[in-house]
């Protein structure tokens, strides 16, 4: 690929990613899906994969119901190109006002750093992978505990007594220097 062609492809991919993120910020599922290659749509979040238009639409629908004010704080300068991918470092913000993964509304606000990797087939978007700290999300929603805090240690003890007991036994066997 010539430098001019490569620059044009990069610009097209960047425009597609920004259009995609703006559609997500508008909670416009049809416009979000329209950024994917015809017949191909896939999103991957920690622990789950949505493959195909209907599954992807359902994943977005659940997010937009759970976090009706969800938005990505995108700085266009945070986009990075690598081969057939565009990588975006952003923050996602929102208020948990609807059910999410079986968790009823907590009314809590969340603000998480997120990295999204958009994979392309030529100029066509085929997959979006998002990476974020699920523990941080659960802590911000009020249902998780930082295991390094007193509350976190108590929660771990109460929720996982056998694991704590085994760890305590193992620690007694380790010779101390």
Where are these regions (language model features)?
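C-terminal and inter-domain tail/linker signature
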Residues: 1-177
């Amino acid at each position: 690929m010539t430098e001019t062609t490569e620059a044009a492809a990069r610009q097209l991919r960047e425009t597609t990613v920004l259009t995609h993120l703006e559609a997500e910020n508008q909670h416009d599922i049809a416009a979000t899906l329209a950024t994917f290659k015809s017949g191909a749509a896939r999103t991957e979040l920690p622990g789950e994969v949505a493959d195909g238009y209907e599954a992807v639409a359902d994943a977005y629908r659940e997010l937009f119901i759970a976090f009706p004010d969800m938005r990505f704080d995108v700085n266009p300068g945070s986009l990075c190109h690598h081969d057939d991918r565009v990588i975006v470092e952003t923050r996602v913000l929102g208020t948990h006002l609807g059910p999410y993964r079986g968790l009823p509304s907590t009314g809590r606000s969340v603000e998480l750093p997120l990295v999204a990797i958009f994979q392309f087939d030529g100029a066509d978007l085929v997959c979006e992978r998002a990476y974020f700290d699920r523990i941080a999300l659960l802590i911000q929603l009020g249902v998780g505990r930082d295991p390094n805090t007193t509350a976190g240690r108590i929660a771990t003890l109460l929720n996982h007594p056998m694991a704590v007991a085994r760890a305590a036994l193992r620690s007694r066997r380790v010779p101390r220097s």
